Amino acid sequence: MIFTSKVEQSFLKESKIKEFTTNIPYLLTDSVPKVGIMSALRFLEWASENEEGIISLSSDSSLKNFIHYTHHFLDNWEKKETRLILEKYGLGDVKKPNLSGLQFVQMAEFYPISPSQHNSFYNQVNEKYIKG
């Protein structure tokens, strides 16, 4: 199997890809929000296995679906509708991950400015990822 992640395997099956036409495997979805769901579920799968892990998250606004669905799944982890989605994508037996132990690493180049400034990397991470 090319993908070892249960989430990735589930999305591969859903995409109905019979064979890869490139050297690098890929996943197909039918919409941009579905990419957000897929990336949020894969992140939560990884975070559940690496609660003290190191992560680097983009500050790009195009990741709004990732942020939205990550918060949605975490906030509604025990609700029936969410449980059905988690089960569908291989996370039915995964306990809700605790993200408080994750460490952020800056991946983009930012001009050094005070963390208290509204457009600082620190502020962007807090507003977009931590506070949601």
Regions found by a protein language model. Name each.
Residues T29-R42:
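A short, flexible low-complexity segment enriched in Lys/Arg and Gly/Pro that occurs
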Residues E52-I55, T82:
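Active-site pocket-lining segments that scaffold enzyme catalytic pockets across diverse folds
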Residues S62-N65, Y111-P112:
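Short, active-site-adjacent cap segments at secondary-structure transitions
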Residues K64-E81:
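Glycine-rich loop at the start of a catalytic domain that most often binds anionic cofactors/ligands
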Residues S56-S62:
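Glycine-rich beta-strand-to-loop/alpha-helix junction loops that act as flexible
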Residues S39-G53:
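Glycine-rich phosphate/diphosphate-binding loops that line cofactor/substrate pockets in enzymes
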Residues M1-L27, K34, L84-G132:
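Ligand-binding beta-strand-loop-alpha-helix segment within the catalytic cores
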